[in-house]
Amino acid sequence: MSDYQLPEVWEAPSQMGGAWGGLNQPTAGARFEQTLPKGDQPFQLYTLPTPNGIKATIMLEELKELGVDAGYDAYRIKIGEGDQFGSDFVAINPNSKIPAMLDQSGDQAIRVFESANILLYLAEKFGKLIPTDPAKRTEVLNWLFWQTGAAPFLGGGFGHFFHYAPEKIEYAINRFAMEAKRQLDLLDKELATKPYIAGDDYTIADIAIWSWYGRLAQDKVWDRAGIFLNVKEYKHLQAWTEKIANRPAVQRGLEVEYKEIDA
């Protein structure tokens, strides 16, 4: 039983503990001056191969597979060292999260942040991997936004308390494992009736969801989390996961060679 007592007004502790405790602060904004490099390709991507980060590289590789001029320079943002709080990065994404992207293909560079928005921006810019039919397009967006709403319970909830927290808290792990299992069961039931998450065609919704839930189904997010959640029992999810994992563009998106920002 915890002896923690709620204060009337919360104040940030001097030491948080855990994997990210030293970086977390209750304020936003740049913490230091830093100039990010820019290459010659149309898209400048500042990211890391996390579940959110790989969405952008997979999407860009899928576009290239479709014959689109979607060349990009990918720069490694070392979030464990705080690169996301540098002034140039914050100018692209004031929320200090990866991935962040600059589209410099036009007269004026356009900043794009939030991984799902990067998917949507690129899909709309090139007219690929999103339907034009209103009903089908809405179904894709249903699932794209489902992922953005559901994944924080998986990552910030289950993943944090299962893998990153400085101590194992039974209530917290049970609470978020329950929700993670519910989400996996939902996807498994949906994929029992159709080849892709939004219907007959592969779309940005599949990229968004696979990057979290497909990787979890492969047990490639947190060590042994897939075993803990018994992901093998979700047969339809597993089949979909394997089908997408075998796509050449997905494989390339996972094997990107990142440039260093301080090289």
Residue ranges and their predicted role:
Residues 250-263:
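C-terminal helix/juxtamembrane-tail motif
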Residues 2-5, 122, 131, 142-246:
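GST-like fold's C-terminal all-alpha helical module
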Residues 117, 236, 249:
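Residue-level recognition of oxygen-bearing side chains
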Residues 1-174, 181:
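GST-like domain detector, emphasizing the conserved glutathione-binding G-site
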Residues 91, 246, 255:
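Phosphate-coordinating loops and pocket residues in cytosolic domains that bind phosphorylated ligands
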